Amino acid sequence: MAPAREGCCPLLLLLLLGLWVAEIPVSAKPEGMTSSQWFNTQHVQPSPQACDSAMRDINKHTKRCKDLNTFLHKPFSSVAATCQTPNITCKNGHKNCHQSHRPVSLTMCGLTSGKYPNCRYKEEHQNKSYVVACEPPQQGDPEHSLVPVHFDKVV
């Protein structure tokens, strides 16, 4: 009986550790960045770049290959202006989302292969509207009444 119990605890510990690691979201913002600064890093790209190199800048913060990411080819101030459109419901049910008035140039990067740091992406260029979640700015954010903090979806 005793040997079975000895084998149980390390397995339970391993299971609990696995559950704890699974709770760390890939999109968790890096320490020292506001949510809006992290949004800017992940989603604002006025001049289009190839997905492999653009995603390298994001993945270095998380030490993982992010599965999917959308880059908006607009300056941050233009994306922040979207926060002034009427509130709509986000995918998660929150009511702090806003949709762009018109379609914008954007690039969607989808992970095709690789393990960090050798992540490989397929890119898809589109001209579509988008939805972002907005919140009041934090210290260090640009001066806007609301700033984008989460990319919700392409519409």
UniProtKB/Swiss-Prot annotation:
Its EC number is 3.1.27.-. Residues 1-28 form the signal peptide. GO terms for molecular function: endonuclease activity; nucleic acid binding; RNA nuclease activity. Disulfide bonds join 65-119, 83-134, 90-97. It is an enzyme of class 3 (hydrolase). PROSITE patterns: RNASE_PANCREATIC (PS00127). Keywords: Disulfide bond, Endonuclease, Hydrolase, Nuclease, Secreted, Signal. This is Ribonuclease 8. Pfam families: RnaseA (PF00074). Has a low ribonuclease activity. GO terms for biological process: defense response to fungus; defense response to Gram-negative bacterium; defense response to Gram-positive bacterium; innate immune response. Substrate binds at residues 66-70, 91. The keyword Disulfide bond applies. GO terms for cellular component: extracellular space. The keyword Acetylation does not apply.
